[in-house]
């Protein structure tokens, strides 16, 4: 049966949640459903991910520089849109958009689904942001969690409305490379403290002399770019550790590499890890909360799990 699904997000910026929602929207529209993506703050957070043809896009543009007034404008506009589509199921992946949708739910009749995409103990940052997230979850008809560990953080009233659904994987992955791979160790993520990229860089520096033909390529953008470049320069590895930025064709970039690595201190389920596994790359990742990596990797069989924060273990792996 054809369904109407509305995905509410602050933007289509270059983060994992936005990437998943674009993949889901693409699949659902192929399945014959009517899909609408509403961006509440497109101007402030960017549009790195393009939506497939056939997906309706609505952008809410606000004019005030005052955060409170802007927030109220976003809610007002969202309510106006949703009142014209009372039979649609509304889905939100991010805490900010979930809070906007939760307030809007007081005035609409739509079914509401929220999805927790990270470690709820760590994200969002700050007790007040977490309180807003927890408040928003009270108004969801259904909540989606990636792992049981993530669901267990919340009170029983939330857990009882929750389901565990791991991340989907792109159905159009490049096939595994046959023959010799490029001598490149690769990762793709936000340049953010959560990802603990300094540990990855230090681990690579420990093996750089042993394997002079190899390089480390870190795709992504973020607040730590200058700090990471300074670290790389201090290690005299500017020609061996590269930060090329965001890549819209990331699958083609990763497919020929020799190894995928993730050093996150915490994570939901890494999209880039799943895609690397699907393309046949050897994978070395930290066994971090909320348990997404250990759901799909049996260490020593289809990848290697290393302790969080253990540079030596990552080097040895």
Model feature map: region roles:
Residues 56, 138-174:
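Donor nucleotide-sugar binding/catalytic pocket of nucleotide-sugar-dependent glycosyltransferases
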């Amino acid at each position: 049966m054809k369904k109407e699904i509305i995905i509410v997000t602050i933007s289509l910026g270059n983060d994992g949640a936005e990437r998943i929602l674009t993949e889901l929207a693409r699949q659902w529209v192929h399945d014959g459903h009517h899909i609408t993506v509403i961006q509440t703050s497109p101007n402030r957070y960017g549009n790195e991910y393009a939506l497939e043809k056939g997906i309706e896009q609505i952008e809410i543009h606000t004019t005030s520089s005052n955060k409170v007034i802007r927030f109220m404008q976003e809610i007002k506009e969202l309510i106006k849109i949703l009142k014209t589509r009372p039979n649609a199921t509304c889905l939100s992946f991010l805490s900010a958009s979930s809070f906007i949708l939760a307030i809007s739910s007081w005035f609409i009749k739509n079914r509401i689904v929220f999805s927790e995409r990270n470690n709820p103990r760590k994200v969002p940052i700050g007790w007040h942001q977490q309180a807003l997230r927890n408040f928003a979850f009270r108004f969801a008809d259904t909540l989606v969690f990636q792992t049981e560990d993530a669901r267990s953080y919340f009170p029983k009233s939330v857990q009882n409305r929750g389901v565990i659904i791991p991340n989907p994987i792109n159905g159009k992955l490049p096939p595994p490379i046959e023959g010799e791979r490029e001598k490149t160790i690769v990762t793709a993520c936000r340049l953010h403290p959560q990802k603990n990229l300094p540990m990855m860089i230090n681990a690579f520096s420990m093996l750089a002399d042993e394997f002079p033909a190899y390089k480390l390529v870190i795709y992504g953008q973020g607040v730590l770019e200058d700090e990471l470049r300074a670290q790389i320069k201090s290690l005299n590895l500017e020609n061996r550790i590269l930060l090329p930025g965001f890549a819209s064709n990331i699958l083609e970039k990763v497919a020929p590499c020799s190894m995928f690595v993730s050093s996150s201190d915490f994570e939901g389920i890494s999209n880039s890890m799943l895609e690397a596994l699907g393309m046949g790359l050897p994978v070395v990742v930290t066994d971090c909360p909320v348990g997404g990596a250990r759901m799909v990797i049996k260490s020593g069989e289809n990848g290697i799990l290393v302790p969080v924060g253990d540079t030596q273990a990552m080097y040895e792996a």
